[in-house]
């Protein structure tokens, strides 16, 4: 005899589904939820439909099926509107649940829908749903989520961003993310924070040691990041060193310290490099700014080390943008540009507001002699973060395109943000040095920058290149030698070798190329320089040799693009005379 199924108890099934979701048993919840939502509507009340679709959406969200969960959250919201928000629907009063707070449930659904849109990179739609929740009805999570989205958008929403972060602090005075973000924006956090702390401690009925909130240690850290946002790395560095003296193995502090050294006027790449290595020793799977570290590894042509970092990041953080920009750098070093672009696009798809990914994409496209294609990426990077690194690449692109006015605007913008910063002065000098009629002014600015910081690598390289262009050969050598005495690097030896090569001092050039390779045997610019020098010493014109190779490649591929390549190469040659 075939056993009959018992009567379906929808309310009990929904209760079981809620237990599974709250226990984070999402696979089991999806399995049960499929049965709940498939019960015919005649056997369910509209209220039960609202709850079951919402819980089913929760189970799918927990399984990272964001597009599917979005569908069911919206379905739940649609039914909610039909039942509770339709004033003409008087016949359905029996379908309403008296003790059900439909407005609060509506806001919770809108928040869940916004999270789905964030996960699938539809941030504008996410913001529209969050903004439809009345301000007074927004909870801590809603305020924090919308503040993050406003922050990603940038200046256009800065006022709303500040208001949202302040509401977060009112609700939770220990939200360090909100405190840091507000201080980075230059806001007086204490006006909100102190009353919020007092209210919190009074609410908890005592001032005993378990309830006292201590944020005295965060002030210096927040201020250091504010100085970084203002392009004042020296001030940031001083503050971070004080924090680091108390928390010497704090990974976040070490990361910010490494970045401060990177942006600093003095040649601090070695300090940056060493701090990142310390972070890797403490935690090889730490993700913060690891793509910046990988860019330093690429710059030094350290392929094995770069590969190791990429493997660790892919294994531990496959859903982070930094992972895929790091992988893109690895392929860029291997000259696999197609793979490099593929991975940098993957990084952008994960986090569109990651400025380094846009900057790297622009750099890759510039390497392909495609400055017009590179320009939007570099402009987006500069829009997201106005710092010397994003400005330098954008200026370089404008110069290649012979857009002197645009290059000058970018250089002046970054220089106005930090007028006493040698690197920004060097960038402005570089733009002016590209215009023969402005070279005298460029020299004044670069000389002032060098006085401000005698060992700023950007200034030294820019001024030495200007000296070479104007025929001041010995001055170029002297300034580079002075830098070399201060800090011996593979870069500086290679630069000096290049200057000697322009004057046909082959023996001196060879000495410095070899010295660069002694410091770093994998340093690609030095290897290329030696290869070029060896051709010259054999009486072979290396440029003619390269042109011949390009002609052969064009004939093999049947592409008639040689004239354009030559024009692009000419642009790059002019640009390379100034750009460090």
Swiss-Prot record:
Keyword Isomerase assigned: no
Example of a GO biological process term: protein ubiquitination
Annotated keywords: Cell cycle, Cell division, Mitosis, Nucleus, Repeat, TPR repeat, Ubl conjugation pathway
Compartments (UniProt record): Nucleus
Annotated pathway: Protein modification; protein ubiquitination
Biased composition (Acidic residues): 542-580
Principal cellular location given in the protein's record: nucleus
Domain of life, source organism: Eukaryota
Subunit: The APC/C is composed of at least 13 subunits that stay tightly associated throughout the cell cycle: anapc1, anapc2, anapc3, anapc4, anapc5, anapc6, anapc7, anapc8, anapc10, anapc11, cdc20, cdc26 and cdh1.
Function comment: Component of the anaphase promoting complex/cyclosome (APC/C), a cell cycle-regulated E3 ubiquitin-protein ligase complex that controls progression through mitosis and the G1 phase of the cell cycle.
Sequence similarity: Belongs to the APC7 family.
Protein name: Anaphase-promoting complex subunit 7
Source organism: Dictyostelium discoideum (Social amoeba)
Gene name, Swiss-Prot/TrEMBL: anapc7
């Amino acid at each position: 005899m075939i056993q009959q199924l018992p009567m379906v108890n929808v309310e009990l099934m929904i209760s079981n589904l809620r237990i599974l979701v709250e226990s984070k048993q999402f696979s089991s919840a999806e399995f049960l939820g499929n049965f709940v939502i498939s019960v015919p509507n005649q056997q369910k009340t509209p209220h039960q439909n609202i709850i079951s679709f919402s819980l089913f959406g929760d189970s799918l969200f927990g399984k990272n099926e964001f597009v599917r969960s979005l569908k069911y959250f919206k379905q739940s919201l649609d039914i909610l509107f039909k039942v509770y928000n339709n004033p003409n629907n008087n016949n359905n009063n029996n379908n309403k649940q008296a003790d059900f707070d439909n407005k609060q449930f509506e806001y919770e659904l809108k928040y869940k829908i916004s999270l789905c849109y964030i996960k699938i990179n539809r941030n504008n739609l996410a913001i529209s749903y969050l903004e439809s929740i009345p301000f007074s009805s927004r909870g801590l999570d809603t305020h924090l989520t919308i503040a993050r989205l406003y922050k990603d958008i940038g200046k256009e929403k800065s006022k709303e961003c500040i208001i949202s972060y302040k509401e977060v602090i009112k609700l939770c005075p220990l939200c360090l993310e909100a405190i840091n973000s507000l201080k980075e924006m230059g806001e007086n956090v204490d006006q909100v924070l102190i009353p919020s702390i007092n209210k919190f401690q009074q609410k908890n009925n005592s001032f005993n040691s378990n309830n006292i909130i201590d944020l005295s240690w965060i002030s210096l850290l927040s201020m250091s990041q504010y100085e970084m946002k203002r392009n004042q790395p020296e001030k940031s560095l001083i503050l971070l060193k004080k924090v680091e003296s108390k928390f010497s193995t704090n990974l976040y502090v070490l990361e910010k310290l490494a970045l401060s050294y990177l942006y600093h006027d003095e040649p601090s790449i070695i300090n940056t490099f060493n701090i990142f290595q310390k972070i890797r020793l403490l935690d090889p799977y730490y993700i913060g700014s690891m793509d910046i570290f990988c860019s330093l590894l690429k710059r030094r042509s350290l392929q094995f080390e770069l590969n190791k970092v990429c493997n660790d990041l892919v294994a531990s953080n496959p859903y982070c943008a930094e992972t895929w920009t790091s992988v893109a750098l690895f392929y860029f070093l291997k000259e696999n540009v197609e793979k490099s672009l593929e991975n940098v696009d993957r990084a952008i798809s994960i986090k569109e507001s990651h400025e380094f990914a846009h900057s790297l994409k622009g750099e890759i496209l510039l390497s392909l002699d495609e400055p017009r294609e590179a320009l939007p990426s570099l402009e987006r990077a500069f829009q997201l973060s106005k710092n010397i690194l994003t400005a330098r690449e954008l200026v370089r692109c404008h110069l290649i395109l012979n857009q002197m006015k645009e290059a000058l605007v970018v250089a002046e913008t970054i220089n106005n943000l930090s007028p006493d910063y040698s690197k920004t002065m060097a960038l402005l000098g570089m733009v002016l040095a590209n215009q023969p009629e402005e070279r005298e002014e460029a020299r004044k600015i670069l000389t002032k920058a060098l006085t401000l910081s005698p060992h700023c690598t950007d200034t030294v390289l820019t001024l030495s290149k200007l000296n070479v262009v104007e025929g001041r050969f010995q001055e170029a050598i002297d300034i580079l030698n002075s830098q070399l005495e201060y800090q011996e690097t593979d870069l500086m030896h290679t630069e000096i070798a290049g200057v000697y090569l322009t004057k046909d001092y082959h023996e001196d050039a060879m000495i410095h190329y070899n010295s660069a390779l002694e410091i770093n045997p994998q340093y690609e610019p030095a290897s290329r320089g030696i290869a070029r020098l060896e051709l010259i010493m054999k009486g072979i014109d290396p440029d003619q040799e390269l042109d011949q190779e390009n002609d052969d490649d064009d004939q093999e591929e049947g592409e008639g693009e040689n004239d354009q390549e030559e024009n692009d190469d000419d642009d790059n040659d002019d640009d390379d005379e100034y750009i460090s």
